[in-house]
């Protein structure tokens, strides 16, 4: 299981920004937040946390890395659900800022 912390979700006007810190197995792993293939029809957003391993040899050292997702929406997003390995790992209420 991947550890994560410091999750925030804010929407300023139309820009949704979700960010966190993810602990990965080595410095060659890059965490990404991408829209899930399955979205509900409400004002929620489902994001998949994907871990991409770079080619090469990397020391097996647990490493904290930032992850950020930004996207313009034409509507207010109220909730963000973050999914990793098919399980919801975080549910965030979006802080709307104007």
List each language-model region with its residue ranges.
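Exposed, flexible binding/inhibitory loops of compact, secreted disulfide-stabilized domains
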Residues: 1-98
């Amino acid at each position: 299981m991947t550890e994560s912390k410091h999750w925030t979700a804010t929407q300023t006007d139309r820009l949704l920004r979700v960010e966190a810190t993810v602990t990965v197995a080595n410095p060659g792993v890059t965490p990404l937040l991408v829209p899930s293939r399955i979205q509900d029809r409400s004002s929620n957003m489902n994001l998949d946390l994907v871990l991409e391993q770079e080619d090469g040899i990397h020391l097996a050292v647990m490493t904290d890395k930032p992850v950020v997702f930004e996207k313009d929406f034409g509507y207010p997003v109220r909730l963000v659900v973050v999914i990793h390995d098919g399980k919801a790992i975080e549910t965030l209420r979006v802080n709307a800022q104007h």
